[in-house]
Design a protein with these regions (language model features):
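Short, charged juxtamembrane terminal tails flanking transmembrane helices
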Residues: 1-5, 176-186
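Alpha-helical transmembrane segments of multipass membrane proteins
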Residues: 18, 22-26, 30, 85-93, ...
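C-terminal halves and exits of single transmembrane alpha-helices
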Residues: 80-103
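Alpha-helical transmembrane segments with an aromatic anchor "belt"
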Residues: 64-83
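Transmembrane alpha-helical segments in integral membrane proteins
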Residues: 145-182
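Transmembrane alpha-helical insertion/packing segments
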Residues: 1-65
Length: 186
């Protein structure tokens, strides 16, 4: 049992690095989408492809395992792969926000919210009054200033927490889809 887990964990670490690079690409496309709006479509595509990529990586691991590939093995592998990927993404986001960004993300976010068509849509949908209420009348600038006050470590923690909520659900679907029963010998 211990060797089986080490084998599974070793491959989860390797594939987690690959998936982590994918997560980092999603984050980079999101940041880049403020300067180049076409990247928002690319970011959306990359984000939606994550469950399929996890399933593909788990299927590749399953092909290396002889005999039964139980739900538990599939779940453990998919969950650990997601966990290791999340660590890489969290590290990259922390380094970016703490040392590289210099306020670009928040300045770009504020600029996009202050565009006339966006302001009009915020008013029409009833979100602007909520922003005014949350910020005690400060508006968009006050909202973005509040986001700036959050430390890079907190954004990193949010990424990890989000992963701990989503990864078990994705892992369960992947494990159910890819489980393989032992074939009976006649």
């Amino acid at each position: 049992m211990n060797n089986t887990f080490r084998y599974l964990n070793g491959y989860a670490m390797q594939y987690g690095l690959f998936l982590g690079v994918w997560y980092i690409l999603v984050s980079a496309a999101y940041v880049g989408s403020f300067a180049m709006p076409i990247l928002s479509s690319f970011c959306f595509f990359l984000f939606l492809s994550i469950p399929f990529l996890i399933a593909l990586l788990t299927a590749r691991f399953r092909s290396l395992v002889e005999g039964e590939f139980s739900f538990n093995k599939g779940f453990s592998f998919a969950f650990l792969t997601s966990l290791y990927a999340c660590v890489w993404q969290a590290l990259a986001v922390y380094i970016y926000l703490a040392y590289i960004d210099n306020g670009f993300v928040f300045d770009s976010f504020q600029a996009s919210l202050e565009r006339p068509e966006v302001k009009e849509e915020l008013e029409r949908s009833g979100i602007m009054p909520q922003i005014m209420e949350i910020t005690n009348g400060g508006g968009i600038e006050s909202l973005v200033d509040g986001l700036r006050m959050i430390t890079p470590a907190t954004y990193t923690a949010v990424i990890i927490y989000f992963n701990f909520i989503i990864a078990p659900v994705l892992s369960a679907f992947v494990a159910l889809t890819l489980k393989r029963r032992k074939r009976e010998v006649r």
